Regions:
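ATP-dependent carboxylate-amine ligase
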Residues: 1-182
Length: 182
């Protein structure tokens, strides 16, 4: 749409094409984290069952290896979607890692139990409450050609636990975990 408007406004299509490589997407929306690793790594804000399914389906298109996904559900939000989110994670990822994501005033363990529901979690899938540890685990098992997708927080730079906001940025934590694993 923006390209059509630009052309209609008299911008030369060659100028538009030359600018395309400089464009970037929205922060935290399928945002690549690349520190020279041999696997793909992305952070996305996906926080609905459809969004989780769509992101995992999209990354599968270009993944030669396994899709490793890390996901949590926010506390004090619609608890009825938690089992649906868990199902989208299990169905869309080769390796599903359930974790916390802004539990707010709720017990993170209860949220995780609701996400997992009656689904069977078997190795190498995991339930790891601490989000940083969950991301580090994903990095530790990634192989060349795999894709890690860290979902749920996207551009957010905090983790709310028991009414307190703690600094936390999936992009930074993922980059640090990758750099530390080299």
């Amino acid at each position: 749409m923006a390209i059509a408007i630009a052309v209609e406004s008299g911008v030369d299509p060659i100028d538009i094409a030359g600018s395309a490589p400089k464009l970037s997407g929205a922060a935290g929306r399928l945002e690549e984290v690349n520190v020279g690793q041999t696997f793909n790594a992305f952070v996305d804000y996906a926080h609905t069952p459809d969004a989780v399914s769509n992101v995992l389906s999209a990354v599968r298109e270009f993944t030669a290896g396994r899709v490793i996904a890390v996901l949590g559900c926010g506390g004090d939000r619609d608890s009825s979607k938690r089992p649906l989110m868990g199902s989208a994670l299990i169905n869309g990822a080769d390796i599903a890692i359930f974790t916390s994501d802004n539990p707010r005033s709720e017990d993170a363990q209860v949220i995780l139990q609701q996400m997992v529901g009656s689904q069977e979690i078997s190795d190498p899938a995991r339930v790891i409450e601490d989000r940083k540890s969950a991301i580090e685990y994903a990095v530790s098992i990634a192989k060349p050609g795999d894709t890690i997708a860290v979902l749920g927080k996207g551009h957010e730079v905090g983790q709310e636990i028991s009414g307190e906001k703690h600094p936390f940025d999936d992009r930074v934590v993922l980059a640090q975990a990758i750099a530390g694993a080299k």
